[in-house]
Amino acid sequence: MTTVRLRENEPFEVALRRFKRTIEKNGLLTDLRAREFYEKPTAERKRKKAAAAKRHYKRIRSQMLPKKLY
C-alpha cells in the first residue's frame, strides 16, 4: 500500500503529485487496469507474444543504419 505523509507547510496539491508519482513508479495503475476485466489465458498469451514481437522489431529498427539520403 502506498502512503504519502504531508510534510510541514506542504500544500495538498504537492502531496497529491508525489502520491501520483509513487503510484506510477510502482506500476499499480497499469496493474489495476489490466485486472479490471477477466482476460482468457489464450488472449493473454496472444497479447504478450504480440508485445514481444513489437519490442523485437523496435530493437532491430533502432540498430539498423539509416538509409543514405542522396
UniProtKB/Swiss-Prot annotation:
Coiled coil (UniProt feature): none
Pfam families: Ribosomal_S21 (PF01165)
GO biological process: translation
GO cellular component: ribonucleoprotein complex; ribosome
Record bears the keyword Ribosomal protein: yes
InterPro entries referenced in this protein's UniProt entry, alphabetically: Ribosomal_bS21 (IPR001911), Ribosomal_bS21_CS (IPR018278), Ribosomal_bS21_sf (IPR038380)
Ribosomal protein as UniProt keyword: yes
Originating organism: Polynucleobacter asymbioticus (strain DSM 18221 / CIP 109841 / QLW-P1DMWA-1) (Polynucleobacter necessarius subsp. asymbioticus)
Keywords: Ribonucleoprotein, Ribosomal protein
HAMAP family cross-referenced by the UniProt entry: Ribosomal_bS21 (MF_00358)
Gene Ontology terms, MF aspect: structural constituent of ribosome
Protein name per Swiss-Prot or TrEMBL: Small ribosomal subunit protein bS21
Annotated signal sequence range: none
Family classification: Belongs to the bacterial ribosomal protein bS21 family.
